[in-house]
């Protein structure tokens, strides 16, 4: 039953990943069809992320009221209905309206399942959870690229993805009773198997032994939140504007650009699958550091003049980004205490999607005033700032741990 339950959680994250990459892949064809400028993709992305921020902040209380299973089911229904509406929307104004439930559904799934896995499973499960997000994010542009190339239609692509989402809704509905059974089993296991003394002591030191009324005052939280903000901003920046960069600055066909963006998400997916095994031997902090370095190398490759290097750069960026987000999430209970983790996870999701909300649209404004070719340079700046923020968290927590042992 435990294996079946994990499969259900992974399927839920596939449903979360599919819509995340669709807009950027379809936009080169959507834009002229709707008769709007480049910047409207950023506005739609901002609305989606705004809904995600709201539902992320509310996820803690929603889980307590209706449970993780029901919240996941309702959220998947919202995203499926919104995607179906995208396929039939007559104008960009309707897309803006439908972006609201799309964001609300995605944020609730993200925050609730991330907290559940961080609190109940090991680091490799967190990496594999986000690997399955990558499966969805990779599949989205592939599906869209097929309909754009074979049917010359982005609308059919959205409709096909909506039908996939509704099939996942059916699976979640059938297996809904399993959530309560697993929760009861987990509760019995925690009562019968208390944490080892070393683990309990580590968690006590991480949280200073009590529930913090203001999680923002915990040591290291603020630079950690900055890392989340910049990570999601950088990841969505490439996902949303990568195809437009390839088509506009590198003269690559729109359907090929959409396919290459799917391979960028494929790099994230494969990277998380592999790092799930690596976490059995290597600490999250080490993987986060090296992931940032690899992503920077991919960004440098995008600056090269030869278009044939672009695919390699995108895949390398995806591989580098792979361990960062799940690693930061899984470290939350250990760094800041399990009793603070639920509330802090909601803050982290909200801040992360704030990056998704504002950084890609701001780049859209910048691209309209300058040129889409500045994408690699902006990405490299963001990655540098994130690296500095992540290392600051490590330094603060290391100094705090050293002083606590004296």
Where do the model's predicted regions map?
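Extracytoplasmic gate region of multi-pass secondary transporters
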Residues: 23-24, 219-262, 266-270
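Interfacial helix-cap and linker-helix signal at transmembrane-aqueous boundaries
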Residues: 30-31, 62-63, 143-152, 246-247, ...
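Helix-breaking motifs and short loop linkers at transmembrane-helix boundaries and internal kinks
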Residues: 35, 67, 88-93, 251, ...
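Conserved MFS/SLC helix-loop-helix module at the cytosolic interface between two early adjacent transmembrane helices
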Residues: 54-93
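Helix-to-loop junctions at the C-terminal end of transmembrane segments
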Residues: 55-68, 271-283, 367-368
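Cytoplasmic helix-loop-helix junction between adjacent transmembrane helices
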Residues: 98-132
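Symmetry-related core transmembrane helices of the 12-TM Major Facilitator Superfamily/SLC fold
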Residues: 156-177, 376-392
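A late C-terminal transmembrane helix in Major Facilitator Superfamily
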Residues: 335-372
